[in-house]
């Protein structure tokens, strides 16, 4: 029971931190997507607590982001894909839980999963926005457009997260891997 309460508290804090970081955008693209550090606390939580808690926290963040930050969308399908599902699948980063350097490869998995959902959204829903002419030549490739457009901001977000995790890895290794949870037990009066 103690660990469940702790996970819920940490999850709420990480979701709130992700929402605040999502408001602090370095750059915002015209059809949605921005460069920010909103993935950082979510990936951190996923790797610390695993896939179960990670999927729930990331899904909750995606839903809250629609209502708090607003959604750039072309209908309910793009809201479902670009917000709820794209962030929800980041919970796969929880596969890195308890593994050596799991924060890094777990983050890459989570970021890649998010990119795949944005990519699918780009080639199915946003293909109408793909340019028809580039450098004076005909361009009719929504798959390439989605790859470049979505890869530009998700890739930069992921690299920023990995750099910060690299800086924090040595001092926070026990916390990042969740090893401190193995040795934490409530005091007798908490039972």
Which residues fall in each region the model found?
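Hydrophobic transmembrane alpha-helices
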Residues: 1-48, 52-56
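Short helix-perturbing small/polar motifs within transmembrane alpha-helices
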Residues: 7-20, 78-123
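Residue-level signature of the transmembrane alpha-helical core
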Residues: 12, 55, 59, 63, ...
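Juxtamembrane/transmembrane-helix interface segments of polytopic membrane transporters
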Residues: 18, 22, 118, 122-130, ...
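Interfacial aromatic-anchored transmembrane helix boundaries in multi-pass membrane proteins
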Residues: 21-34, 60-95, 126-130
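Alpha-helical transmembrane segments and their helix-entry boundary regions
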Residues: 54-58, 75, 103-110, 146, ...
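Individual transmembrane alpha-helices with interfacial aromatic-anchor signatures
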Residues: 140-160
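Single conserved hydrophobic/aromatic residue that forms the stacking wall/gate
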Residues: 183-191
């Amino acid at each position: 029971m103690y660990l469940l309460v702790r996970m819920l508290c940490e999850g709420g804090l990480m979701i709130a931190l992700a929402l605040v970081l999502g408001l602090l955008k370095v750059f915002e693209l015209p059809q949605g997507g921005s460069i920010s550090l909103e993935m950082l606390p979510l990936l951190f939580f996923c790797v610390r607590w695993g896939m179960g808690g990670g999927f729930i926290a990331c899904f909750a963040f995606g839903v809250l982001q629609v209502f708090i930050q607003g959604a750039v969308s072309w209908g309910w399908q793009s809201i479902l894909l670009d917000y709820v599902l794209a962030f929800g699948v980041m919970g796969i980063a929880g596969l890195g839980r308890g593994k050596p350097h799991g924060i890094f490869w777990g983050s890459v998995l989570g970021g890649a999963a998010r990119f795949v959902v944005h990519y699918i959204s780009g080639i199915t829903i946003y293909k109408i926005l793909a340019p028809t002419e580039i450098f004076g030549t005909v361009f009719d490739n929504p798959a390439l457009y989605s790859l470049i457009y979505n890869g530009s901001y998700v890739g930069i977000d992921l690299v920023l997260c990995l750099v910060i995790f690299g800086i924090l890895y040595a001092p926070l290794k026990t916390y990042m891997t969740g090893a401190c949870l193995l040795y934490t037990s409530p005091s007798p009066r908490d039972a």
